[in-house]
């Protein structure tokens, strides 16, 4: 039954190889959204890399704190959390914000994964919802907080845009 036996992937080498391909492919996903090989595409590529790295680092730190050692699978999962969380913001944030978003993604998605598995007893074998779903929601919210000065909640016209988005 659920929760009695941990079921990690059978071949972590292939998991890491697949994660590497996913990471490289995500550059095309985020930088390709700029539809031109210009500075915005380069920035999207940079922030994608930084967020994925920070997500992996944060997840690794959480495992180290809670279990005494990190796992390869955890580092890969943190990387995917960083990638998913930066996607909504990749065209509108700078490098420092990308690191904060990635670190936040690693920590929040780590706790979301544990909560969904252990408290809700939902068997999500690839942790799809806590990593991609929670990460995407978090990224959407953080995009509004950290995006450029023309668009951001704190520096742009965020309040009136928020009112407009809810039908006001």
Feature roles, as predicted:
Residues 1-168:
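Glycine- and aromatic-enriched membrane alpha-helices
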